[in-house]
């Protein structure tokens, strides 16, 4: 087994990387035996080829860098499949399961419209913004990898699959310990998404589901929302403009703190096919006029 990212294609494709190479160590190979240092120059692969890329970057990809220096792949040509463990870019010998720095893989495949298959993302200990925008704009992406972490980090999955218009099924999301903005806009504008993940967490964090399924126009059924402890803006605009959504989840909130802000703000605005209107608990109604709140915010 070769510990590296593996790239294949259906026709001639050029793969390169933009961003700052300073402090990074990456190698490439066409046979998994003969390795050469990669200086981000263009690498060509044909239908019968496999390109391998690996690294030794124990401090992570984007540690201490400005956003305009973050590294990201570029692909031009045919459709591209990417296999292998993403952590082979961090330490191909040991394959750690800990993300070593904040924003580590930020935008790594952003706008790679040729990418159809995502690599494995096995890390169980995440870092702030580690997968933010990672596959944003990957309009050909149809297959994602598992996301096994059960404890999340601030904005770790935010905008991760934004605009992945070919994605029909979301990966499982087993996390029970959330973080601020962890799922913010994760699937926004995934217009083909039909199968949504279960969301098992019972205690929410500020903006955790903010715009999570915004404009997912193929989604017909929302996931169950079992949370009993909410947070500021936790569900804000979560299903906004999900024009095919027919069934809304129950909102079984048992604990609401006085002063809680925007937890259901705009949650179902623009859901023009909705057949059942969500109902809030009596404890919530007692804190404001429910009808007014629904008209102005929830629906």
Name these PLM-found stretches.
Residues 1-299:
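Negatively charged
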């Amino acid at each position: 087994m070769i510990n590296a990212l593996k790239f294949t294609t259906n026709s001639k494709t050029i793969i390169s990387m933009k961003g700052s190479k300073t402090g990074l160590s990456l190698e490439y190979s066409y046979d998994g035996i003969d390795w050469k240092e990669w200086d981000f120059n263009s690498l060509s692969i044909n239908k019968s080829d496999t390109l391998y890329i690996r690294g030794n970057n124990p401090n992570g990809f984007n540690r201490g860098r400005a956003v305009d220096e973050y590294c990201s792949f570029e692909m031009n040509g045919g459709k591209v499949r990417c296999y292998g463990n993403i952590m082979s870019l961090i330490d191909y010998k040991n394959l750690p399961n800990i993300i070593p720095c904040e924003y580590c893989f930020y935008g790594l495949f952003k706008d790679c419209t040729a990418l159809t298959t995502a690599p494995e993302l096995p890390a169980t200990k995440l870092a702030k913004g580690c997968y933010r925008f990672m596959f944003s704009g990957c309009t050909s992406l149809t297959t994602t990898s598992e996301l096994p972490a059960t404890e999340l980090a601030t904005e770790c999955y935010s905008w991760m699959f934004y605009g992945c218009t070919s994605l029909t099924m979301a990966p499982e999301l087993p996390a029970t310990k959330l973080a601020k903005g962890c799922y913010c806009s994760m699937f926004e504008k995934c217009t083909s998404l039909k199968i949504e993940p279960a969301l098992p967490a019972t205690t929410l964090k500020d903006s955790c589901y903010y715009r999570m399924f915004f404009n997912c126009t193929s989604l017909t059924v929302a996931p169950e929302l079992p949370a009993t402890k909410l947070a500021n803006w936790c569900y804000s605009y979560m299903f906004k403009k999900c024009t095919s959504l027919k069934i809304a989840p129950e909102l079984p909130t048992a604990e609401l703190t006085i002063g809680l802000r925007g937890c259901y703000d705009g949650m179902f605005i623009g859901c023009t096919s909705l057949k059942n209107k969500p109902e809030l608990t009596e404890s919530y109604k007692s804190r404001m006029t429910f009808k007014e709140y629904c008209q102005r915010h929830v629906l």
